[in-house]
Swiss-Prot record:
<dbReference type="GO" id="GO:0046274">
    <property type="term" value="P:lignin catabolic process"/>
</dbReference>
<comment type="subunit">
    <text>Monomer.</text>
</comment>
<protein>
    <recommendedName>
        <fullName>2-pyrone-4,6-dicarboxylate hydrolase</fullName>
        <ecNumber>3.1.1.57</ecNumber>
    </recommendedName>
</protein>
<feature type="binding site">
    <location>
        <position position="251"/>
    </location>
    <ligand>
        <name>substrate</name>
    </ligand>
</feature>
<comment type="similarity">
    <text>Belongs to the metallo-dependent hydrolases superfamily. PDC hydrolase family.</text>
</comment>
<feature type="binding site">
    <location>
        <position position="178"/>
    </location>
    <ligand>
        <name>substrate</name>
    </ligand>
</feature>
<feature type="binding site">
    <location>
        <position position="154"/>
    </location>
    <ligand>
        <name>substrate</name>
    </ligand>
</feature>
<feature type="binding site">
    <location>
        <begin position="29"/>
        <end position="31"/>
    </location>
    <ligand>
        <name>substrate</name>
    </ligand>
</feature>
<dbReference type="Pfam" id="PF04909">
    <property type="entry name" value="Amidohydro_2"/>
</dbReference>
<feature type="binding site">
    <location>
        <position position="128"/>
    </location>
    <ligand>
        <name>substrate</name>
    </ligand>
</feature>
<dbReference type="GO" id="GO:0047554">
    <property type="term" value="F:2-pyrone-4,6-dicarboxylate lactonase activity"/>
</dbReference>
<dbReference type="InterPro" id="IPR052358">
    <property type="entry name" value="Aro_Compnd_Degr_Hydrolases"/>
</dbReference>
<dbReference type="InterPro" id="IPR032466">
    <property type="entry name" value="Metal_Hydrolase"/>
</dbReference>
<comment type="pathway">
    <text>Secondary metabolite metabolism; lignin degradation.</text>
</comment>
<feature type="binding site">
    <location>
        <position position="47"/>
    </location>
    <ligand>
        <name>substrate</name>
    </ligand>
</feature>
<dbReference type="InterPro" id="IPR006680">
    <property type="entry name" value="Amidohydro-rel"/>
</dbReference>
<feature type="binding site">
    <location>
        <position position="75"/>
    </location>
    <ligand>
        <name>substrate</name>
    </ligand>
</feature>
Length: 293
């Protein structure tokens, strides 16, 4: 399959945001795809995207006004983290990463990932993206992570309560992708947001990403339901929120977002300079570049 025959899920000419991020701002949730000729996709991949390599990611970073990236291993690459490690290496200190690993990984392999810039592992519970999510094996590997690492968990709101005992048992900090995908049409006091707040209140070391208006708000831009539902959460948990573009927007080929508009959501969910600095600089620095704090 040629590159042009694969899925295009990102805007190739994103607008320039009206909002200017603060100096040192971090895009703390993005991915790279391939290039496939160098980094083949997993045989188990549920989608086959076009190449979206580090040069494209870093050009977007600069275009949007960010200083650093946290690159999350994309599910299409399975547990082979080579593409993500390559992108981190090319960033010359301006990127860190989140790996996806076989739970049987040994300590030497984890140490090598740490040396390569990884600072956590991701557990994915979206059945359309992964075939197996063994909680017992996930807990075992979570107990062997290098010092300072955390676990990123991706799930949808309808299984939050089912996952609570599993998350309670994780022995390291947790970061929740996309707030556990709440139905933002319910508003800030809806059942999904209330359940997510209960989760955040259960542990002081659970963080979240206030991300993906394009995924969570089916009405489309300007994503008013997302802004209305998420702004109170950011205000109430300002020390535990981070943000990212989600570029190159896996599986969003039917509703490709404009990254400039995605960035312009920031002041709507974090309306003060103080909140913006926490979400974009202080908090992700604590998680990913703590040695510089």
């Amino acid at each position: 399959m040629t590159n042009d025959e694969r899925i295009l899920s990102w805007n190739e000419t994103p607008s320039k945001p009206r909002y200017t991020p603060p100096p040192g701002a971090i895009d703390a949730h993005c991915h790279v795809f391939g290039p496939m000729a160098q980094f083949p996709f997993s045989p188990k991949a549920k989608y086959l995207p076009r190449d979206a390599g580090p040069d494209m990611l870093f050009a977007l970073r600069d275009h949007l006004g960010f200083a650093r990236n946290v690159i999350v291993q994309a599910s299409c690459h399975g547990t082979d983290n080579a593409a993500t490690l390559d992108a981190i290496a090319r960033a010359q200190g301006k990127a860190r990463g989140i790996a996806v690993v076989d739970p049987a990984i040994d300590e030497a392999e984890l140490a090598a990932l740490h040396e390569g810039g990884m600072r956590g592992i991701r557990f994915n519970f979206l059945k359309r993206l992964v075939d197996d999510a063994p909680k017992d094996k996930f807990l075992e590997v979570a107990g062997r992570l290098p010092a300072g690492w955390h676990v990123v968990i991706y799930f949808e709101a309808d299984i939050l309560e089912e996952l609570r005992p599993f998350m309670d048992a994780i022995p390291v900090p947790i970061v929740i992708d996309h707030m556990g995908r709440p139905d933002v049409r319910q508003g800030p006091d809806g059942a999904d947001m209330k359940a997510f707040r209960r989760l955040l209140d259960s542990r002081e070391d659970i963080w979240f990403k206030a991300t993906c208006p394009d995924r969570l708000d089916p009405a489309g831009p300007p994503w008013d339901d997302f802004a209305r539902s998420v702004a109170p959460l950011v205000a109430d948990y300002a020390d535990r929120v981070i943000w990212g573009t989600d570029w190159p927007h896996p599986n969003m080929q039917d509703a490709i977002p404009d990254d400039g508009l995605v960035v312009d959501m920031i002041p709507r969910i974090a309306p003060t300079p103080e909140l913006q600095h926490k979400m974009l600089v202080t908090n992700p620095m604590r998680l990913y570049w703590s040695e510089e704090m």
